[in-house]
Amino acid sequence: MSRKRVDLLLENMMIESCAAEGKALTHWNGIVVFVPFAVPGDIVDIRVIKKSKNYYEGRIERIVEPSKDRLEPFCEHFGTCGGCKWQPLPYQLQLDAKRKQVEDQLVRIGHLEVPEIRPTIPSDQIRYYRNKLEFTFSSRRWLMKDEDPE
């Protein structure tokens, strides 16, 4: 499935739900649009940066109206390191999204019949508990979010 670079701005889009990999989603003209760092209920302007046959990927250009559930990220590295993609989401909503993701992957993607999936067991520690790092290597310089790659 090939991806094409596009430059499309979708304005005043309501974020509908959480998706896999810490992203959220909305729909535009029947196409699913995945957006990192968004919270269900946010109204945002989205810059579409990649387009594939069945979905678009975008980034938040502007938060028009934040969701009532949106939290201020607590980590100074939020949005850069990739470790805590759901920081703006309250912890209970993170747990609910993770349970829904498991169910979705088993039922919708795996075509399995499963019993009711119990709630995700919460951690006593809800900050600084991650033990995963994501490293990216390249022979090219790292670009920050506000830099133009062209």
Please provide the spans of the model-predicted regions.
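SAM-dependent transferase fold signal centered on methyltransferase-like domains
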Residues: 1-150
